[in-house]
Amino acid sequence: MSAPSAVQTPSRPKMDTKTMVSIAMLTGIAYIVMLLSKLMPSVMFLDFDFKDVVVCIGGFTFGPFAAAIISILVAFIEMLTISHTGPIGFIMNVLATCAFSCTACFIYKKVHSKKGAVLGLACGVACLVAVMLLWNYLITPIYQGLPRETVAAMLPTVFLPFNVVKGGLNMALILVLYKPVVTALRK
């Protein structure tokens, strides 16, 4: 007679206490960076927000799942505290940050090198641009009350350059800051 077989359930990746504390700390830092970014002038409803730098560094360090967690937490805290955009802004915020950060972190996890970081970040910028162009085309007419034709005309002249510059600046900052920050986080 054979022993009863135990049913094995797929295990989730476990986070140790240090990882959870680091993610919480990075969430707080990302929120502060987002607050400081709000001090910069904005054009229409487009804001440069450098929290993606912190989110992506967290993802490079702890993986794409951590980047998604940090992104969701920061966007949720922002929605509850200072945002005037409500759930639509929350969704847009999470989509933009995850499109950039999770894409970059996933590729970096697979190709763990400087080349992988650059490739991941470049793909993250491309994903950010694609997602935000689609989101702006679909939601901005509803949210801002603009005719869809007006928004469609703004895609190549306003939204495309804005998101390319935003993604490019975030990419440059990450490439400069990643090694020193990661060295400090791993201590």
Where are these regions (language model features)?
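Loop-helix junctions at membrane interfaces
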Residues: 1-187
